[in-house]
UniProtKB/Swiss-Prot annotation:
Belongs to the CoaE family. Pathway: Cofactor biosynthesis; coenzyme A biosynthesis; CoA from (R)-pantothenate: step 5/5. It comes from Vibrio cholerae serotype O1 (strain ATCC 39315 / El Tor Inaba N16961). It is found in: Cytoplasm. Its main location: cytoplasm. Catalyzes the phosphorylation of the 3'-hydroxyl group of dephosphocoenzyme A to form coenzyme A. The gene is coaE. Keywords: ATP-binding, Coenzyme A biosynthesis, Cytoplasm, Kinase, Nucleotide-binding, Transferase. PROSITE patterns: DPCK. ATP binds at residues 12-17. This is Dephospho-CoA kinase. It is an enzyme of class 2 (transferase). One of its GO terms (molecular function) is dephospho-CoA kinase activity.
Length: 202
């Protein structure tokens, strides 16, 4: 398995942009926790079968896929149901990430985990890279991107780990405050650093 760098950051911090630059500029393999989280609840998976057995068939669309809106509604006001769902899916997602990481072939791999701090997944990586953005900018970007109100954007931010909590576990920090932030020079330096570290890790 490659040397693993976990990439995290709050909502609208620019994680996807950063990950794509690592991939497009330097050919670094990406493993995205959000993609794996969707994969483990696809039709015919054990994850979706367990969800349907627990919540009933009304949680599915007519085509057999998960009705995410219905599921969100069911767990929103029921912390015990949310806890049940997390207990079911988190081990599946962790295993999916491990499996995907074993398939990577670049000198190091980027493991993209938005909720790294919240789910205490930093042990899955050799290094943690945090994309850091001022919270006011996060709120503005979230409002513009997701077409939500300021109150909704603030609520999303409040539900995530704080900026300080993320920075506390960071080995490396990539600043992405400005609209025209020069990301590539920062990423190039980090890439060179991770290449050197991955060679030492052999």
């Amino acid at each position: 398995m490659s040397f693993v760098v976990a990439l995290t950051g709050g909502i609208a911090s620019g994680k996807t942009t950063v990950a794509n630059l690592f991939h497009d500029q330097f050919g670094i393999d990406l493993v995205d926790a959000d993609v794996i989280a969707r994969d483990v609840v696809k039709p015919e998976t054990e994850g979706l079968k367990a969800i349907a057995a627990h919540f009933g068939q009304a949680i599915l669309h007519p085509d057999g896929s998960l009705n995410r809106a219905a599921l969100r509604e069911r767990i929103f006001a029921a912390p015990n149901e949310k806890a049940w769902l997390n207990q079911l899916l988190h081990p599946m997602i962790r295993q999916g990430m491990r499996n995907a990481l074993t398939q990577t072939t670049s000198p190091y791999a980027l493991l993209i985990v938005p909720l790294l701090v919240e789910n205490q997944l930093q042990t899955m990586a050799d290094r943690v890279l945090v994309v850091d953005v001022d919270e006011k900018i996060q709120i503005e970007r979230t409002m513009a991107r997701d077409k939500v109100s300021r109150e909704q954007a603030e609520a999303i931010l409040a539900a995530q780990a704080s900026r300080a909590q993320r920075l506390a576990i960071a080995d490396d920090v990539l600043k992405n405050d400005a609209e025209n932030q020069k990301l590539l020079p920062q990423i190039t330096l980090l890439h060179q650093k991770y290449l050197a570290m991955s060679r030492q890790n052999l």
